Amino acid sequence: MTFEQLAIFVAVAEREHLTRAAQAIRLTPSAVSASIKNLEAFYGVELFHRVGRRIELTQTGRVFLNEARATLARVRAAELMLSELGGLQRGQLNLYASQTIASYWLPPVMMRFHQAYPGIDLSLTIGNTRTVADAVIAGEAELGLVEGEIDAPELSSAVVASDALSVVVAPDHPWADGRALSAANLVADSLWVMREKGSGTRSAFEEAMRGFGIVPQDMQVALVFPSNEAVLSAVQAGACAAAISSVSASLYLQQGLLVKAAFELPARSFRLLRHKERHASKASIALEQMCRVVTPRASAS
């Protein structure tokens, strides 16, 4: 049994889908399928049920998954130690980041890091705030970057930048005329397009509404989307408002595709997460230092 076979098995088991697993680990579906079949044949076990185009773990597969994950974690710990011995000359740093940060704020930081340490392979996975925190807790990522607060006692949290949410509307929306708005107007006078629950953007907006004495469930939510771009496109096309990161909305505002409504929302923090009990690699420390010298407002200008 090889490390690659273990990694392939875990990827397929977690997704229960050959093609998605192959994409995640950058192999062809045929290579993934062959690896699983070879593993089953060599040990005389069946790890997956093939049900039409779907696959499901057998009871044997479910039991083996726990051991496979533990073994991979031990191997990665050994790899981390070796990369430490080599300093910052080579190695890998796995990052998870919430969408706003990953799409608009983090790429320039990653580019500067690559230029400084070209031998370190940076891997970035995008999720919402909750999935980013879960990845750091599980050891799938050494660092996570999220918007706003996160309630996870296993993690340390450091503010690396700040951002503001803006209420944006289409140019033909009534709020585009610059009229002063109250929190009550936000509830009564417009439909809304929102990010999904669990996203830092939505959590920050709902927390701000509570601070204004508004129950978030009273907002007239017309549509929910899993990405900032989808939210912005929907607002541009219809009679809805949205609360979105100023960084992500900046180009739309500059081009006149959207207008910022006259309602100020509190600033929020971009936070860097790491596990309190896991060793901090030199690469992660170097990246954290680079994060601390960037501000999203500079990126948006």
Question: For the regions a protein language model found, what residue spans apply to each?
Answer:
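Short helix-boundary/capping micro-motifs
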Residues: 10-31
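Flexible hinge/capping segments at coil-to-helix
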Residues: 157-193, 197
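Secondary-structure junction motif
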Residues: 175, 191-213, 281-285, 297-299
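Hydrophobic hinge/microswitch elements
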Residues: 128-133, 137-141, 146-147, 206, ...
